[in-house]
C-alpha cells in the first residue's frame, strides 16, 4: 500500500521537454509528404501552435483541409517524430525535482501529444520509469484547454484538488488547470 497522498501533474511539450524543433520539423515533413504546398512559419509555429492539438491548429495553417488529410498528416507526424528527437531538450531542473518528490507524490503526465510520441521521448531520455501515469490525447475526449485530463489523473489516484499541483507552460494548459480548480506552477524557459 502506498503512503502517497499528493499528485504532481506535468505537461510534456514546453514543460518537461523543449520539443518545438521536433514538432515543427515532424509536422513540416508530414505536410510535405502529403504533397500539400504549405510552409509553416517557424516563429508562428512556436508562438501559436506548438503544444496545441493538431485538430485545432492544422486547419489554421492549411485552408479547406479535409478530415482525411488531417488524419494522414497527424499519423505521418507521429511516425516520423522520433527521427527528430535529437533536437529535443530535457528540462533537467524539473526532472531533478521529480526525483526529489517522487517518494511523496504520484507523478503524472497530462499532454495533448500522442501516446506514441510521449513514449518515444520518454524512452529516448530513459525517464519513463519516473511516471506513474501517462494521459495522452488518446485517453481524453476533450484535450486541453479542457480539464478532462487533469481530472482523470486525480480520479485515477483518488487525490483531491487541494493535494494536486500542475506544472504547465502554455496558455491552454493554464486554462485547463484553472477549470480543474487546481494550483499550478507556470514553467517558463522554452516558449
Where is each model-derived feature located?
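Substrate-recognition element of Asp-dependent hydrolases with the DxDx(T/V) motif
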Residues: 94-123
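Active-site neighborhood of HAD-like aspartate-dependent phosphohydrolases
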Residues: 1-44, 179-180
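Short beta->alpha linker loops
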Residues: 22, 49, 53, 76, ...
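Alpha-helical substrate-recognition element adjacent to the catalytic core
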Residues: 33-64
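Asp-based, Mg2+/Mn2+-dependent phosphohydrolase catalytic module
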Residues: 1-6, 115, 120-191
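Conserved SAM-binding loop
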Residues: 16, 47, 107, 142, ...
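Metal-dependent phosphoesterase signature
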Residues: 59-96, 105
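An amphipathic alpha-helix signature
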Residues: 24, 28, 51-59, 115
Amino acid at each position: 500500500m502506498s503512503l502517497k497522498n499528493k499528485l504532481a501533474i506535468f505537461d510534456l511539450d514546453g514543460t518537461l521537454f523543449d520539443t518545438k524543433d521536433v514538432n515543427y520539423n515532424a509536422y513540416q515533413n508530414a505536410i510535405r509528404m502529403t504533397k500539400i504546398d504549405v510552409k509553416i512559419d517557424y516563429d508562428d509555429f512556436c508562438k501559436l501552435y506548438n503544444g496545441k492539438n493538431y485538430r485545432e491548429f492544422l486547419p489554421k495553417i492549411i485552408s479547406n483541409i479535409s478530415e482525411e488529410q488531417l488524419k494522414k498528416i497527424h499519423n505521418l507526424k507521429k511516425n516520423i517524430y522520433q527521427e527528430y528527437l535529437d533536437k529535443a531538450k530535457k528540462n533537467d531542473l524539473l526532472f531533478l525535482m521529480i526525483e526529489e518528490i517522487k517518494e511523496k507524490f504520484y507523478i503524472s503526465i497530462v499532454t495533448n501529444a500522442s501516446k506514441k510520441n510521449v513514449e518515444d521521448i520518454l524512452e529516448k531520455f530513459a525517464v519513463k520509469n519516473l511516471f506513474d501515469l501517462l494521459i495522452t490525447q488518446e485517453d481524453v475526449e476533450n484535450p486541453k484547454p479542457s480539464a478532462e485530463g487533469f481530472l482523470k489523473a486525480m480520479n485515477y489516484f483518488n487525490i483531491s484538488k487541494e493535494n494536486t499541483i500542475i506544472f504547465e507552460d502554455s496558455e491552454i494548459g493554464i486554462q485547463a488547470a484553472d477549470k480543474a480548480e487546481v494550483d499550478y506552477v507556470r514553467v517558463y524557459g522554452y516558449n
